[in-house]
Structures are given as structure tokens and as C-alpha cells.
A protein has these predicted regions:
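Active-site and substrate-binding clefts of carbohydrate-active enzymes
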Residues: 3-179, 320-384, 397-582
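The substrate-binding groove and active-site-proximal loops of carbohydrate-active enzymes
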Residues: 26-37, 182-198, 245-259, 277-284, ...
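Acidic (Asp/Glu)-rich catalytic clusters
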Residues: 49-51, 206-219, 381
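Short, solvent-exposed turn/loop segments enriched in Gly/Ser/Thr/Pro and often Arg
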Residues: 59-64, 222-225, 280-288, 443-446
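Extended, H/D-rich, highly charged conserved domains that either
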Residues: 139, 145, 150, 154-209, ...
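CE4/NodB-like, metal-dependent polysaccharide N-deacetylase domain
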Residues: 242, 246-283, 374-384, 397-406
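Catalytic domains of cell-wall/extracellular-matrix polysaccharide-remodeling enzymes
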Residues: 255-320, 411-434, 438
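Glycine-biased, low-complexity coil/linker segments
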Residues: 389-392
Length: 582
């Protein structure tokens, strides 16, 4: 590393969607997996394909990889033999008539409006006209006036708006539909469905190819996206919030074994998809504890990544002077006696992409971010050495520092004009050619020997405010944990009895993993939007019901009752949160 004076810069895009399929019906309750595939996963691959000098780490969750495979397969089967499509909104592109039941028609009308208003609806005149009409007719009293053609046209525009910008600019058929505006035929809907199926099916092969040619490092999250520190120890939630109320159960039963299962299964699914084992891990929500890092180290990961606010909390306990020293950040660390290297993202720069730059001109935003990085490169290079500074963190920047910018790789872009097209194109171009910056990957940083500092203390926390309060502490969140604990105890009892055959045992174990996902707990709490809370609350309880049925047990009656009610209107609809509370 000493031979290259440039400051290493790593972009990490985290791709995740929880399991939206209802295992009892086979239908997807929410469409976000295939929509983000055709828009964001597609565009993010295309930007790297268009610029051979572009580099990034792309993190996939196994539960997302499995959904991509299933959805693409079921679309292909439908086109080949007419089998049902997995999603009710996607099914509007198929040959079946629009449901006649008024309640179903109303639900479909409303579903086709779930797109960012300014950038995805108002951008297209015909879609805005249809959306305005749908809003007028979107009541139980008026929905009967919504014709089948209106609903079909609205569904076509919904999917056109959710297409990646790189597809919109290159696909002739999409241009034809966009110019036509209305009165789409069944044949056109089928062709659009075929395009969507091809886009979803192409995601894994495209990223695998980018990895094989050295542009993209692929990493993984434990299988079901669980908050591993909480699986290991509920008390870890009090590490950053000492007085946090906890669930009634003292701990998650068998949590250590479940955490190990999620890690093992993630490596299996990842290898099946990409043909090799992952070198690095982004723990779900960047949530870590000492036990979490030790578990990932034992699993053989070369690196793990989380947030600087977690590092700041840890340093403040052991070395307050270092916690205030800017040179302590954008540095790799390692537990004493461990092998795995820990990277802590630059929260400020990451949140600029997630929450600020969407309102800027894309080129201006990219230049601003690169200027911030160049300033850091000069600052680190000019900093005094450890000996002259008299601290343990030192300067000698490019040889010791690496800036990680890590964030959700899918939800930010709908707030940008053109799905972030101009920003991302300019960002990759500027970073790849800057004389002070080296666009690279985390495994390359490890391989080149950037010297890690010792991580003497670990504060359990996440990239959201440096705490675990997003997933525990609220009464609804704690109740959800208690319901999960009770289901796990039932699971343990049935497994110990030996009454299930091997296939049923495996199905129950995977279903338990889906119930352990962090996503359900994220949405509980009255500060979240009502619709999202209702949907995720219902789906979580449904996942638990499926688990009980796989175990051959009657589901508890309380699973028929909502856990939480949302009343809030958070930034970005609550799907993303800043590193620091505002």
C-alpha cells in the first residue's frame, strides 16, 4: 500500500428485501423485491458495466437472492405455460381479467400509486393523469367507475416508472410504450412482463460477471437479516441505551446456535449464487457486538463493516482523546487476537448520498462528494506521525486510512431525478480518475495490508444512531420479540420430539429464520407510517402462523391481533434512517 499515495475509497451498496411471500398461498404480499430488481439492482450493475474503471462492494442478503431466483422462475413459467404470477400487481400484466370484486379493484388501484410522487409519477404526464383519476376513484363508493382498461394502463405505467433509467434509455420497446401513453394491449403487457422477467433473471449473472472481471466485490449478510447482537444477548441493547426496556423473556432461546445457522446458511446460498465464498460480511443493519464480531471471525470472513457511530461509542469508553481525534476514523480496526478486519463507514459522507444529494444537480453532488474525499486525503497526508503527535492513532494517511461509504443501495435513488443516473455516472467517473483517490474494495484494502488499529472495546450498536433501539425497547417491538421467543420455544420442543420428517424439519428451520429477520422489528412503533406498519405487522404475524403450522401446532390466538399501529410520517417513508438523530 505504501507504493500508492492515493487514499483508498470504497463504495458499499447494501441490497436487501425481506421475504414477502406468504408461504401458505405462494403469493407475494408486497412487490418491492421485483420492483427494486428492475430499477435499482439493474441500474447499479449498468453503471459499473458502462465504466470499466468503476469499482464497488455490493452486498446481497441470501433471502433476497432466493426471492430473485423464485420470482424470475415463476415469471418464466407463466410466460411458458400460463401458471399464476406471484404478485397481484404483476399479474395485471398477464392475460387474466381484472378481478371483479370491488375491494380487490380498490386495492389494485392503490397499489399502482406506490411510487415516489415527484420523480416517478409527476415525471410522466400520462401516469400523472391516470394517477389523479385513480385517486379520485380510489374509494369504495367510486371504484366501480374504474374500467379494466384504466387499471391495466395504470399497471403498465406503474411498471414503466419502476424501470431502471438505464433500461429506459436503451430499450426501444419501453420508448414505444412511453410515447403511446394509453390503451396498452394485452400483447404489449405481455412483452413488458417478459422484459421484467429478463431483468430480474439477469441480476445475479450480471453481478457475478462484474465480480469475475474484478470490478465488483460481492459480500453477504447472515441469511435472514437478523440482528445478531440481539440473538446472542438481549442485554446488548442496553450497551448504548442503559435504561432500555427489554422483552419479558430474558434472552432469545438458543440464540447463539441460531446466529451460527444464519451465518452458515448465508455462505451456502451465496456460493450457490456466485460460485465462490464471500470474503466479507455486512451484518444486518451494521449491528455488531463483540460476540458478533467473534462469530464472523470464526466463520472465516476477512472483513466486516459497520458504522463510525458504533466506533465512536466504543472509543469514548476507553480513549476519549482518540474518540475526538478525526484520524481515529476512516481506519480499519481488529479485535486483539482476531484475524478479521473491521471497517467503519464514514457516516457523514454516506448520509449525504442517502438524504442530501437527491435535491442537487447530479454533477454538482458528485463533485461535492469527491471534493470532500480529496480534502480528507490531503488532511490525512499532512497529519503528524504517531510519534510526533503523541497519540495512538497517527497520521500518514493513505498508508493507514481507507474511507468507506456504505448505504442502502436501493431505496435512495427514487428520490433522485432519473433514479440517480447523472449522479452515479459522474461519481464513478470522478473517483476513478482522481489523482488523490483510489477507488477500490475492502478485500483489496485487507490484502494490501492497511494496518488495523486494535479494537479494545466494542459497543453493541448499529448504523442507526449507533444503538439497537430501532429493533428493541419500544413496547410493540418487545411484544414482537416475546412472540418470537414463544415460537422458538415451541420450535425447540417439536424438534426435540423427533415427530417431524427431515423435509418438514428443514422447512420449519428456514421459516424460523424468516421470523428472525430484523425487518419486522424495524417497522413496529407509532413513529412509522400507518400503511407500512400495518403491512409488516400482518406479514410478521403471518410468518409466525406459518411456522406453527409447519410444526404441527395451532397458532396462538394472539397472532390474530395487531402488534403495532403507525401514526408517523418519517423521512423517506421510514425505509432509510440517518446515522445520527436530527
Amino acid at each position: 500500500m505504501a507504493s500508492d499515495p492515493r487514499l483508498p475509497v470504497v463504495l458499499l451498496w447494501h441490497m436487501h428485501q425481506p421475504q414477502y411471500r406468504d408461504a401458505l398461498t405462494g403469493r407475494y404480499v408486497l412487490p418491492w423485491t421485483y420492483l427494486h430488481a428492475m430499477k435499482d439492482y439493474t441500474d447499479m450493475a449498468a453503471h459499473m458495466e458502462a465504466n470499466p474503471a468503476a469499482r464497488a462492494v455490493v452486498n446481497f442478503t441470501p433471502v433476497l437472492l432466493e426471492q430473485l431466483e423464485e420470482i424470475s422462475r415463476r415469471i418464466a413459467e407463466h410466460l411458458r405455460s400460463g401458471t399464476p404470477l406471484p404478485d397481484p400487481v404483476l399479474a395485471l400484466l398477464g392475460p387474466e381479467p381484472v378481478p371483479a370484486e370491488p375491494a380487490e379493484r380498490l386495492e389494485l388501484l392503490r397499489a399502482c400509486l406506490k411510487a415516489q410522487r415527484k420523480q416517478m409519477i409527476e415525471r410522466f404526464g400520462p401516469y400523472l393523469e391516470l394517477a389523479t383519476l385513480a385517486e379520485t376513484l380510489g374509494t369504495a363508493e367510486r371504484v366501480s367507475y374504474a374500467s379494466d382498461q384504466l387499471i391495466h394502463d395504470l399497471a403498465v405505467w406503474y411498471h414503466l416508472a419502476w424501470l431502471g433509467e438505464t433500461v429506459r434509455r436503451s430499450d426501444t420497446f419501453v420508448s414505444i410504450l412511453t410515447q403511446q401513453g394509453r390503451a396498452f394491449t394485452a400483447a404489449q403487457r405481455r412483452e413488458l412482463l417478459s422484459l421484467i422477467g429478463n431483468l430480474v433473471a439477469s441480476i445475479v449473472p450480471r453481478y457475478r460477471k462484474l465480480s469475475e472481471r474484478g470490478q465488483c466485490e460481492l459480500s453477504v449478510t447472515p441469511y435472514g437479516h437478523p440482528i445478531i447482537p440481539l440473538l446472542l444477548d438481549f442485554q446488548s441493547a442496553r450497551d448504548a441505551v442503559p435504561n432500555m426496556p427489554l422483552p419479558q423473556h430474558p434472552s432469545y432461546p438458543g440464540g447463539a446456535e441460531r446466529a451460527q445457522w444464519h451465518v452458515r446458511e448465508s455462505m451456502r446460498v451465496f456460493k450457490q449464487a456466485f460460485g465462490k465464498e464471500p470474503g466479507g460480511c455486512w451484518p444486518a443493519e451494521g449491528a455488531i457486538s463483540r460476540g458478533t464480531l467473534e462469530l464472523l471471525d470464526r466463520a472465516g470472513f476477512k472483513w466486516a463493516a459497520t458504522s463510525a457511530n458504533v466506533l465512536q461509542g466504543a472509543l469514548a469508553r476507553t480513549d476519549p482523546k482518540a474518540a475526538r481525534d478525526s484520524r481515529a476514523y476512516n481506519r480499519p480496526y481488529r479485535l486483539p487476537g482476531g484475524s478479521m478486519v473491521e471497517f467503519f463507514r464514514d457516516d457523514t459522507l454516506s448520509d449525504l448520498i442517502g438524504f442530501t444529494y437527491a435535491t442537487w444537480h447530479g454533477d454538482d453532488a458528485a463533485h461535492n462528494l469527491v471534493n470532500e474525499l480529496a480534502h480528507l486525503a490531503r488532511q490525512y497526508a499532512e497529519a503528524p506521525s504517531p510519534e510526533s503527535a503523541g497519540t495512538g492513532v497517527g497520521g500518514d494517511g493513505p498508508k493507514r486510512h481507507a474511507v468507506l461509504i456504505a448505504l442502502d443501495g436501493e431505496n435512495a435513488w427514487e428520490h433522485y431525478p432519473f433514479n440517480g443516473y447523472y449522479f452515479l455516472r459522474a461519481l464513478y467517473s470522478l473517483l476513478a480518475s482522481h489523482p488523490l483517490l483510489e477507488l477500490t474494495t475492502l478485500s483489496e484494502c485487507v490484502a494490501r495490508g492497511i494496518e488495523p488499529l486494535p479494537l479494545q472495546t466494542v459497543m453493541a450498536g448499529s448504523w442507526v444512531h449507533g444503538t439497537l433501539a430501532t429493533w428493541m425497547g419500544d413496547p410493540a417491538k418487545n411484544r414482537a420479540w416475546d412472540l418470537l421467543c414463544e415460537a422458538k420455544l415451541a420450535f425447540d420442543g417439536v424438534m426435540a420430539s423427533g415427530t417431524l420428517d427431515a423435509a418438514r424439519r428443514a422447512a420449519a428451520e428456514r421459516q424460523l429464520a424468516l421470523c428472525e429477520s430484523s425487518d419486522w422489528f424495524w417497522w413496529f412503533g407509532d413513529y412509522n407510517p400507518a400503511d407500512a406498519v400495518s403491512q409488516f405487522d400482518s406479514l410478521y404475524r403471518r410468518q409466525l402462523v406459518v411456522l406453527y403450522r409447519l410444526l404441527g401446532l395451532p397458532p396462538p390466538e394472539e397472532l390474530a391481533q395487531p402488534i403495532s399501529v403507525g401514526r408517523g410520517s418519517p423521512e423517506h417513508g421510514g425505509v432509510m434512517r440517518r446515522a445520527y438523530a436530527t
